[in-house]
């Protein structure tokens, strides 16, 4: 895994992708830091971090689109799979390399509260706790990007899928309001999601038996639960969407 990590980290540090990612994150951070702290004199660095969470919508797809998709396109994934490193080790090595690239601008951002302390009182505890939450939020977004890069050999498709899903997570509060909270509508929605999951599994492993079994078992379990106790489905969509609302988790960090 260490060899994969070093190889991937070197590839990003010797190309424009890694530097473009870091530049964009620091550019947005600088703009909001100037607006909130330097111009408006807000004493809380958390305002800047909370305002710039949208940066992941653009920066993460750029960073992650090639990490595994390029391997599949160039057919070099076969070399990786025949290496003594496990599949989980390959994925983890690549993921940690991306997180390391992301950690570089985070280290730079860690100096901002120190700069603020020269001009007034700064709550370092809350500032660095917010920075930790921002780092974890970005790491979660990067994991999503790695997943979509793994299921396609097209960098463009991987980037688009990552953007769409991150945008959906970003707008989760608004999306949840469009769904009914009734048990029936929730059950039907979950049934559709199970079918979609089965199709995704089939597209990845090309095994109709396994994907079909997942679909049948999931749908049967859904019907049984609805018949036995339908009340558990009330407001279920909103509860599930809240779990995937990454931005709200950061705001409450």
Predicted regions and their residues:
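Helix-loop-helix units of permease transmembrane domains in multi-pass membrane transporters
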Residues: 67-97
